[in-house]
Curated annotation (Swiss-Prot):
Any one Gene Ontology BP term: viral genome packaging
Naturally occurring in which organism (per UniProt): Human herpesvirus 7 (strain JI) (HHV-7)
Record protein name field: Capsid vertex component 2
Region annotation Interaction with major capsid protein/MCP: where it falls in the sequence: 1-46
Compartmental location: Virion; Host nucleus
Amino acid sequence: MTQLSLFYQFPIQPIFEGHVRNTLICTEEDMQQLQNLGIRKLRKEKEEIQKNKILKNLLKTELDVLQAHVQTECQKLNTNLRDIENALLLENQKIIPSSETHSVLEESLQAKTVTQVTITQIDPAIHFTENFRPEMIKTFYNNTQMWSYTFGAWFYKLKRAFFTDSKLKRMLKLTYVDSLSITQELLSISINALEQITIYPMHDNLVSDLEAGLCLLTAFFASYPGTFLTENIKFVDVIQNLSQIFRYLNTEILATKNASPQDFYFGFNDPDKMKYFIPLCKGRHYAINTFSNHILIKIFIKKGVIKQVPGDQMSKGHVVIESKLTGTLTDDKLLYWTQILLQPKLGKEVPIFVHQQQYLRSGIVAIESLYLLWQILNSESIFGKRTGKFYLTTIFPHVNAEDVTETEFSSVNIQNFEFLMKNYVVPTYLANNESTISTLFPGLISIVVNESVRLGWDHNQNTLTQTNALHSQTKDNPFVEYIRSQLEETAELAVLEKHDKILFHFENGLNVTLSLALPRHRLFAMASSLFNVADLYDFLYFLVLGFIPVATVI
């Protein structure tokens, strides 16, 4: 029972009522401490503000000084540039008439973006911007919607080899295995494989095979009195005078052959089971006597181009090359001319060919390639009666008859080789100074390699070539293996081994072809049976393009 609530009490009683003694008492000492603490805090904040203000003033002063210095230096630079521009303008006005200045500037700007090459003397020039061969392939396929073309038995065999692999078949867009035509993808990757053969995939490969060969030829040509060589010579000058140099070289080769027929050998004595082109003995040296039997090495030693190849014993009685490096530079002809030709490109990093022997070997192979072309291309006139079915209009349908001229016609003085060097090799090298034999002449690679493969030669069982010996053959195409390894992204060493296998076939094919009395007939027969080549006109374009399309009826 609840208690009775009184009438004067509230319904809800407050909780926690304040105590009567709950009061805050601050003494005077406490108030003084609080006041001092506040004063110190305010003084600290004021000092911090003054410090930041001083730092900002100092930074502004330093920036003003820096700005004034930069303006002064920029004014000096502008003044110097203005003086240089005025001097160049005065010099150009002395050299170029004012009426021709505009056209010369236009030509120089165009030369930076467009390169012009000419293959034969009866055709107009061809312009390209970056990559000559891919642009030709693209142009050809853009203009062939109404026709079907065949490229020869070799490309058709490539198509059949890849057609059985479903993955590669999709990648290369192969259809209709019975059709002789091939896709743009297959042609492009095949030509790309041909272009890579003499490009060695090394990060420290400073000199192309073409440049190495030109250095060797320059040193050889310098051994004759009364030559045109000066210390201002460039690679372009050597290329334009290759015909004259090869006349001297041909005389030496024939003299060596007549004196000792067994010395007429253009090959290398590699040890058995050698897989890679790069030398592995003592740094960058090949095995002993690798160069001993090569006729060009014997000629170079005879003419004093090189004193002795390290590790070889074929030049007894000569001092070793190391002793020559301590003497005057002009005593070593090869090193002297190599430095003159390569110094604008490499500076002081010019390699010594007899010590980094991959340059010596690749240069010799490049000389053999150009020498073979010199023997073949001037065998007949380009203006003779044609038997082939390929014309430039196959790639460029809109070529007019007026574009085909015969202004350089000469019935006695045939200069197909000289014309090709001047109007194709020179502008291509100027556009890309890393050009090699395979990038210049992929067609030559395919013919020579197929000649070596046809003979059944095997680099792993390398012996001196015997003309009276027959070799068994296999159906293996080294290009099929190389292209497949690239498409399937095989390990780098495996791809390199297949690449070098083709390179060794190319070396052996050159040895076999140059050893023949009439190399032209052998190469033309091979090109005719595999690549649709019927005459010299076809052969010239096949050397450069790597393919000859001929219209076919389905």
